UniProtKB/Swiss-Prot annotation:
One of its GO terms (molecular function) is tryptophan synthase activity. Its EC number is 4.2.1.20. Transmembrane segments: none annotated. This is Tryptophan synthase alpha chain. The active site is at residues 47, 58. It comes from the Bacteria. It is an enzyme of class 4 (lyase). The keyword Iron does not apply.
Length: 266
């Protein structure tokens, strides 16, 4: 049983809290400290973003974070070292990479997965993963060999045919994109969000975690009433962006925000 499957079956929470931030922003050491702060604040799963030059699914806040990380020339070796330091701080909390396929392909699928697993990563979210290619089939097989999860994104535009295809290779949980467009904070969500999540639960029979746009404790609490998990990225990245020049202040503001979100969905 994968670590993520075990977590969702444990009954430890009403809805999982899955924060996200981009590795390497604003620098190597602060990435480690921010990761530790988020874990201490009550993350059930921590999603770590690997910087890539063409983050097509990301909104402006995360795009700027990625740009800062790339400006630092954050290497694969540094990504894996930072990840391991975060993992060692709280080894019981699953870590997941959000990455585009190009970095995996560039590194080499087996090399990337070996290093990721050694660093404490138990699953991948790949927004632009191609289907029905030799590379994707290799990735599916190599993930299964390592008991690592492949977490697919489902959007409001996903067809039944697409959802059925995703069901065959999805493990861990489904990342449900709450609204059209890229990542970023939003004031309102679709009126049929609750029904859509229930449909996915019945169809795919995996935990459904909602992300894209959630930023306030009130939003998190509302959606946690019917989603198995809440994913928050842009709001966390904004805290880092606005306070990153003062690491101590950033940690305090981040800790306060994470604690409030965690309390809202407990």
């Amino acid at each position: 049983m994968s670590k993520i499957k075990e977590l969702f079956e444990s009954g430890k929470f009403k809805s999982a809290f899955i924060p996200y931030f981009t590795l390497g922003d604003p620098n190597y050491n602060d990435s480690i400290e921010f990761g530790k702060t988020i874990l201490d604040g009550g993350a059930d799963i921590l999603e770590l973003g690997i910087p890539f030059s063409d983050p097509v699914a990301d909104g402006p806040v995360i795009q700027r974070a990625v740009a800062r990380s790339l400006k630092n020339k954050f290497s694969f070796d540094e990504i894996f070292r930072v990840t391991k330091q975060i993992h060692l701080h709280k080894q019981e909390t699953p870590l997941v990479y959000l990455t585009y396929f190009n970095p995996i392909y560039h590194c080499g699928i087996t090399k990337f997965l070996d290093n990721a697993k050694d660093s404490g990563v138990v699953g991948l979210v790949i927004p632009d993963l191609p289907f029905d290619t030799i590379e994707s089939e290799t990735l599916f097989q190599e993930l299964r060999l390592r008991d690592m999860d492949l977490i697919h994104l489902v959007t409001p535009a996903s067809t039944k045919k697409r959802i059925e295809a995703l069901r065959k290779t999805s493990t861990g949980f489904i990342y449900y994109v709450t609204s059209f467009g890229v990542t970023g904070e939003r004031r309102e969500f679709s009126v049929d969000l609750k029904e859509r999540i229930r449909f996915l639960k019945d169809t795919i029979q995996l935990p459904i975690c909602a992300g894209f746009g959630i930023s306030t404790p009130e939003q998190a609490s509302q959606i946690a009433g019917y989603a198995d998990g809440i994913i928050i990225g842009s709001a966390i990245q904004r805290v880092i962006e606005e306070n990153g020049q003062d690491a101590s202040k950033a940690k305090n503001v981040l800790a306060d925000y994470i604690t409030k979100i965690r309390a809202s969905i407990s």
